[in-house]
Amino acid sequence: MGEKLTLEEGEFLVRLARKAIVHYLESGKKIEEKPPTQRLAEKRGVFVTLKKYPDDELRGCIGFPEPIKPLVEATVEAAISAATGDPRFPPMRDPSEMEEIKIEVSVLTPPKKLEVDNPKEYVEKIEIGRHGIIVRRGARSGLLLPQVPVEEGWDEIEFLSHACLKAGLPPDWWCSPDCEIYVFEAQVFEEEEPEGPVRERDLAEEQ
């Protein structure tokens, strides 16, 4: 990952995500936006999370774990997919629903594989409040963003177990030598309320 984003750049991405969803729901077309800074033109992984306000109930979360697209383009696509393509939820159809939705954008570092001699070492290498994780076995994978264990109050074992479940694997699969674990970090920018001020979350402080 390149340099960290400024709060202004994070705010731009959050506003862009909202604009992209509303524009798509109104017109069926994907918005095109030029990156205002060089950092926002870099290829980076990104996830867009939609939460119902004020209870923070999840409404959708989609993204790109790998840095395969320029950040602005990836944010637009992830936002639209989070609103209309998350299989866990009915697709959003009415733009007015966005008036009750809070947006969070997580900008990721490239995933890094953890090398261990014993799977139990994973527990020591993962830091709650810092790391997101990806569990992989063949074509199956499960990703959890770093804010998830903080919000759920999980420890490292629970974090690993839930990532396995998300991959469609048994919860203790992380103990298997066939399992691959990747970690990444994220800058997380969120609206305090729908269309409200944007802040950068400090996950370590939230624990």
From Swiss-Prot:
Protein name per Swiss-Prot or TrEMBL: Protein MK0488
Residues spanning the signal sequence: none
Organism whose genome encodes this protein: Methanopyrus kandleri (strain AV19 / DSM 6324 / JCM 9639 / NBRC 100938)
Residue ranges of every copy of the AMMECR1 domain listed in the record: 8-200
Record HAMAP family: AMMECR1
Pfam families: AMMECR1
Membrane-crossing residue ranges in chain numbering: none
